[in-house]
């Protein structure tokens, strides 16, 4: 047996091998040591010849899913080695083979998956400066593919990875030359990475694989060789690990990168689209506010919409019109919501059905979901909007599938499919006949017992059963002399003897044969039903997709109706004009407390950049985030929290909000900040929306202000970028840019001050702030009064150009320039010479920033 184990393990070196022995999956040697640690199992041993004892641990086969899930969640692969023949019928060693390799990206079991999230596996391949990229969720059958070209391909690639957030990544080709990619995956994604050999991406082989899988759709990708290569490599990997066909994956969704708004990792994190930055919880995120879906399919699609805002006006308007129709019809909206609540996860149910792992309970769940389809169809029959009409036409009532399952499968079937009890009486005449014989067994045995008592005259004769001897006749010792010669003794006990007769063995054969025939017949009937349902995959899949879309639209309509959201005017202009905008998440968290609304007016002509000044804690960051969130909501087709809104299509949103040391990569707060700013400057376009919060605060005052101004100038200049920008800063000196730069306007957070007390009014008003109110904010934060008083004294001295050194009693000169270390050491300094040779009037903002760094390095 151990030789068999070694042979199979040799072929699966990169996996933890679950080796079936009886009722357990056993692990040996290093696998056992690893599993015992990760799963907290007792490590034992097994003799394996030549005085060697192999480390061993195991888990019961009937409860293995939980253990496998824990290993896969930690990034391990698990190879399932099953007994492929009945041990009772085996001649010699039981045959065993790998039936499946479970990896983080190939999980299908519902108990191992989050119903609200897709579980993607990704494959990427690069050749000739072109990247092929695909994502597949094997549990739902979804497959997305794209091709990335151009100088910004790395940025596009990481944005795609962020949006799909795969659990497992397969890479090959020139992708390995992207040195920063492994760092990104390790820091930003919870995904395992596997390098595939070059031959896995062989174009001719991959072409054959893709053609065989998608005969009718191959033409959509045939001219994109890198896409064909990643699809072929991924499909081959899935076949190798799943040991089965991939009938569930029957459609390629090819998309272009310019179909969706670009959202990089920092933007998705800073806007807290699906989880909060601090706790990583759903509560407090935009998804938490918008996701009132009733089905698992809807929950996954809602998340996908948030991560892929649209750029197509028609598609956006179609979604909006559907939401508007439901908002305006309360009764329809409530009825649809209630009906959706009864629909199970059709997508993942169908995956288990197609791959033959579904049990009778899964079929009943599908039946229960289908039962609601006629009502949903009837509710939508008179809808007017294009989107709801499309959904209505896409919903197949599947009445034949419902009738089949409902007539065949009992209401509450057992979990297992190999012990009978699944098929309804009346569904199959042969089964009813066999089951009748089996159910009458007690009556038959009672009659035999009565007959034998009459024949023998033994009053306490009994007919019983055990697994060893089958049916037997039991006679107590006091009546042994009355036993007929036709009785064959089988067992002697202390107080009785047990016998069999030929007639009893014949009856036993009929009874036990009926049980076996019944179980086998039930399984065959169940399997026929399952296959019939599987054969209707495309019909059911199309309906499931329609239900998911209806669920998301209805959820957004419910949120809009409950929170007084309005339909924004999304158009092709360059304007973002919102009246009385509110932050949807903050408003939801405040519950009954009022949220102070604010306006915004940006466009590419006269109002490109809004400089926002004001004290910390006053609401600058909240305001900027809410504008970005409202734009994003508008482009997924949602209504928005405002009294009116005009949104010109934005191709990307970039955010630079807050920073912290990146200890893992050895980057300081300032380095992280500058890296993010560099990414924005490199990848933003004139159609982007930029949210820049406190640029330059991670370094000294002069350096920080210089960098902030340079970035501001670059964003405002239409020849260089000209993007719509919200620019919050504590450098009040930058407010002068309103007079110096075209398209720049000043705004501040209104503050009401009475004596030493301040009140943040949370209103955005025109003009720059005249005070940072830092000491007042410190007071609000709970800084001790003694520290506050001392701070006021120091501030007063600084404002008069003085600072009293109490230890040395030295008073500095009244020269405000001395409050910062001079960049210029002396008249002979090389810094002076460098400055003399520089024409500052011709410097670009970025050149000025580079010069600043050079000067700093010369000091």
Locate the predicted segments by residue.
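Conserved catalytic alpha/beta cores of large enzymes that bind or transform nucleotide phosphates
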Residues: 161, 166-174, 180, 195, ...
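Charged catalytic and DNA/RNA-contacting regions of genome-maintenance
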Residues: 1-325, 334, 338-354, 358-450, ...
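Short flexible coil/turn linkers enriched for glycine and charged/polar residues
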Residues: 12-13, 72-74, 115-117, 127-130, ...
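Hydrophobic/aromatic-rich, well-ordered segments within soluble, folded domains that form packed cores
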Residues: 68-73, 77, 168-171, 301, ...
């Amino acid at each position: 047996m151990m030789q068999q184990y070694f042979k199979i393990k040799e072929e699966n070196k990169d996996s933890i091998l679950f080796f079936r022995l009886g009722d357990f999956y056993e692990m040996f040697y290093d696998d056992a040591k690893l599993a015992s640690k990760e799963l907290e199992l007792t490590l034992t041993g097994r003799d394996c010849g030549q005085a060697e004892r192999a480390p061993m641990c195991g888990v019961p086969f009937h409860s293995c899913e939980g253990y496998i899930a824990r290993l896969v969640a930690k990034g391990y692969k698990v190879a399932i080695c099953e007994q492929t023949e009945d041990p009772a019928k085996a001649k010699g060693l039981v045959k065993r083979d790998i039936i499946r390799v479970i990896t983080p990206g190939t999980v299908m079991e519902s108990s191992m998956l989050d119903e609200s999230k897709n579980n993607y596996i990704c494959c990427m391949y690069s050749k000739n400066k072109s990247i092929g990229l695909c994502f597949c969720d094997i549990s739902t059958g979804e497959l997305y593919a794209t091709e990335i070209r151009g100088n910004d391909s790395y940025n596009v690639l990481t944005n795609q990875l962020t949006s799909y957030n795969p659990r497992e990544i397969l890479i090959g080709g020139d992708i390995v030359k992207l040195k920063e990619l492994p760092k990104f995956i390790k820091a930003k994604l919870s995904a395992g990475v596997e390098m595939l050999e070059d031959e896995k991406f062989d174009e001719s082989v991959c072409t054959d694989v893709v053609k065989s899988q998608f005969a009718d759709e191959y033409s959509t990708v045939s001219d994109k060789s890198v896409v064909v290569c990643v699809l072929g490599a991924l499909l081959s990997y899935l076949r190798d690990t799943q040991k089965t066909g991939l009938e569930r994956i029957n459609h390629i969704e090819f998309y272009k990168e310019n179909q969706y708004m670009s959202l990089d990792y920092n933007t998705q994190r800073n806007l807290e689209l699906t989880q909060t930055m601090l706790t990583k919880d759903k509560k407090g995120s935009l998804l938490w506010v918008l996701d009132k879906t009733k089905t698992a399919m809807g929950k996954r699609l809602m998340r996908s919409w948030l991560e892929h805002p649209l750029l197509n006006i028609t598609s956006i308007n179609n979604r909006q019109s559907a939401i508007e129709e439901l908002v305006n019809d309360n009764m329809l909206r409530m009825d649809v919501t209630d009906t959706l609540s009864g629909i199970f996860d059709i997508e993942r149910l169908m995956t288990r059905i197609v791959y033959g792992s579904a049990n009778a309970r899964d079929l009943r769940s599908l039946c229960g979901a289908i039962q609601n389809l006629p009502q949903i169809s009837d509710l939508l029959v008179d809808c007017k909007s294009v989107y709801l009409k499309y959904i209505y036409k896409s919903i197949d009532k599947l009445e034949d599938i419902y009738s089949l399952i409902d007539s065949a499968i009992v209401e509450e079937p057992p979990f297992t499919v190999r012990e009978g009890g699944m098929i309804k009486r009346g569904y199959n005449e042969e089964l009813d006949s066999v089951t009748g014989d089996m159910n009458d067994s007690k009556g038959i045995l009672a009659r035999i017992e009565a007959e034998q008592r009459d024949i023998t005259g033994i009053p306490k004769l009994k007919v019983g059963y055990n697994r060893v001897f089958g049916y037997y006749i039991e006679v107590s010792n006091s009546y042994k002399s009355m036993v007929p010669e036709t009785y064959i003794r089988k067992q002697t006990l202390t107080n009785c003897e047990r016998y069999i007769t030929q007639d009893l063995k014949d009856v036993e054969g009929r009874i036990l044969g009926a049980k076996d025939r019944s179980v086998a017949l039930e399984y065959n009937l169940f399997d026929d039903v399952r296959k019939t349902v599987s054969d209707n995959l495309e019909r059911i899949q199309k309906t499931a997709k329609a239900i998911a879309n209806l669920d998301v639209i209805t959820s957004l309509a419910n949120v809009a109706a409950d929170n007084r959201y309005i339909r924004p005017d999304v158009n092709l202009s360059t304007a973002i004009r919102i009246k009385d905008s509110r932050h949807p998440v903050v408003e939801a968290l405040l519950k009954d407390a009022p949220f102070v609304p604010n306006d915004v007016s940006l466009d590419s002509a006269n109002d490109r950049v809004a400089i926002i000044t004001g004290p910390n804690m006053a609401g600058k960051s909240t305001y900027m985030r809410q504008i970005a969130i409202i734009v994003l909501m508008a482009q997924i087709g949602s209504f928005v929290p405002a009294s009116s809104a005009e949104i010109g299509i934005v191709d990307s949103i970039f955010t630079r909000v807050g920073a912290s040391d990146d200890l893992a990569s050895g980057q300081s707060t300032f380095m992280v900040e500058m890296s993010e700013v560099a990414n924005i400057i490199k990848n933003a376009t004139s159609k982007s929306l930029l949210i820049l919060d406190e640029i330059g605060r991670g370094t000294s005052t002069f350096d920080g202000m210089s960098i902030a101004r340079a970035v501001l100038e670059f964003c405002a200049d239409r020849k260089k970028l000209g993007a719509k920008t919200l620019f919050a800063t504590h450098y009040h000196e930058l407010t002068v840019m309103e007079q110096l730069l075209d398209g720049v306007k000043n705004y501040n957070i209104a503050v009401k001050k009475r004596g030493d007390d301040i009140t943040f009014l949370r209103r955005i008003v025109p003009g720059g702030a005249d005070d940072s109110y830092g000491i007042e904010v410190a007071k609000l934060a709970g800084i001790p009064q003694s520290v506050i008083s001392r701070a006021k004294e120091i501030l007063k001295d600084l404002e008069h150009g003085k600072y009293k050194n109490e230890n040395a009693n030295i008073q500095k000169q009244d020269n405000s320039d001395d409050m910062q270390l001079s960049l210029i050491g002396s008249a002979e300094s090389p810094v002076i010479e460098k400055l003399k040779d520089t024409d500052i009037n011709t410097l670009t903002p970025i050149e000025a920033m580079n010069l600043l760094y050079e000067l700093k390095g010369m000091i």
